């Protein structure tokens, strides 16, 4: 499908399962890619950080992995601030970059309950549970963790001006910070959630 659409290279996230290893995740995705007609590579998504995971990084480097994604959200994927700090330091030693999904998980879950209590259970409630400060606080926290680790860091799918401001403050302090956004955050607004097909626009972070 990628080649038919004119895409000649794909970088997919090979996601570690809780209780599993990075090597297992890499091998699983390698098997999925068997017979692929285009060039491909893998980012690694780390769902569990411990001494065993840290010890695997040199092997991942040998296999060509240069970036790892961490999540501040989702029970099956998120890691705590201490793990982010340790992973940043370990990745730097390998010349790799840590990418992070930034949202405050505890706060947004509280807000989900508040929104539900108001009777908002459809798409229109999604951005109310995840307003801009939910991302901005997580970005600010990540910037300080990276500062303490002395490591570069990459924020994925940045969606708010407030989050951008926090990253700019970190850069002004001399930190090495990389950012990305996505077309939907530049071209669409949360007004989409009020539409009849609003469910199509549910994503996290929201519009």
Where are these regions (language model features)?
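Glycine-rich, flexible loop/turn motifs
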Residues: 36, 42, 199, 203
